[in-house]
Amino acid sequence: MADAGIPDEILYSDISDDEIIIDGDGDSSGDEDDDDGGLTRQAAARIVTDLGFEVLQPLQSGSEGRVFVARRPGEADTVVLKVGQKPSTLMEGMLLQRLSHDNVMRMKQMLARGPATCLVLPHFRCDLYSYLTMRDGPLDMRDAGCVIRAVLRGLAYLHGMRIMHRDVKAENIFLEDVDTVCLGDLGAARCNVAAPNFYGLAGTIETNAPEVLARDRYDTKVDVWGAGVVLFETLAYPKTITGGDEPAINGEMHLIDLIRALGVHPEEFPPDTRLRSEFVRYAGTHRQPYTQYARVARLGLPETGAFLIYKMLTFDPVRRPSADEILNFGMWTV
């Protein structure tokens, strides 16, 4: 657990500079003062106050709105308020109203003030990225298994409702401890996903699945890939899946780095896709197809963890197991 004296701005990590939301014609990223259609942090704080809350601490804003730790005067419990005036904030709130699962963020309330929507959310101790940073070391297999199993349970629930999260990463996984884990931030989620299609670019480059980066058709299996990257990061911290220390320049460069780092074999590329036609030339034959990735094998990770990472990071999404299928693997002991 994190030290109780650590302030929230440390317990909650920054939004990645490489977060992308490009769905249709929109494009949002970063934390500029007008990144929510002109809703400044000061204006959002006034909305929070007008709604009867006391702002305790601003958190790093994302592409979908301003975020604060707050509480109602006279109440001890704190909450996280997400304030935005883009349609996506309202849509996220409407989606959260439909959800009820222990491993998916439960919205307490949705409020409106003029054109702005305010989501009242639980205040967790920290996010997984910050938890790993404060530990300054990887988790053991027991703790990593607890975290990723909870994430997979949340994903299985969402996928059963035909909801695709599209931004599974350590920053969007919230916890009190490794036994109390919740998947949050559904601002990039897509509903009514019945079959693979190109639903636009969304999420974060470093955790995007290859089919997203290649702009191919995709479905809920992209969330399994993101969870696989998270599992790698929890077991191999501070190493990254590509071995690079700098953020990806763009999606295509990250995809090339990924193919090379994992040692993806040409036979593992899905047929009749842009992924194969445009990127198979970066593959190698030094590794047998459908065996453990070179990048993972070199690190000496726990055998169970290495197996799960390989399955979740199966390059061809058709071969990649679903969250439900992984949860039914016989190796779970946590």
Curated annotation (Swiss-Prot):
It catalyses: L-seryl-[protein] + ATP = O-phospho-L-seryl-[protein] + ADP + H(+); L-threonyl-[protein] + ATP = O-phospho-L-threonyl-[protein] + ADP + H(+). GO terms for molecular function: ATP binding; cyclin binding; cyclin-dependent protein serine/threonine kinase activity; protein serine kinase activity. InterPro entries: CDK (IPR050108), Kinase-like_dom_sf (IPR011009), Prot_kinase_dom (IPR000719), Ser/Thr_kinase_AS (IPR008271). It is an enzyme of class 2 (transferase). Pfam families: Pkinase. Belongs to the protein kinase superfamily. Ser/Thr protein kinase family. This is Serine/threonine-protein kinase.
